[in-house]
């Protein structure tokens, strides 16, 4: 299946809708392979697809327990969650929507870098925060490095304002 041409919808606690087909959480490895084809790469019970932009994690009994998109804002795979484009939506807006659907405890112990929504088993991650970019700009300016129009600064600013990964797991996946 060409993942980049099918609409991809994360359905928390249920699975991944690929066009009109569903890859359910708790699917067997055989079911996953029948839908997606053979994985491009394996690391133990982790299967990777689409040049490592999609990861499937299987438990010890060979059942799908976690689905994660790893491509971020510039990736070819652009999933939706609750009708929002997960990587194109601003980080704060997505957090608000996930919090609303979660209606319960959120693990925000990573201080803005990641959140785990315990009731809906959704996790998001980014490697850089807006305040990190501001600190980088201040440091560059102190060292006489131009920041206005600097492509590295602009790239980091875009990355800080969006999520780099989003994943869904079986109920209770996040403790």
Name each model-derived stretch.
Residues 1-175:
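Short helix/turn-capping signatures at newly exposed starts of structured segments
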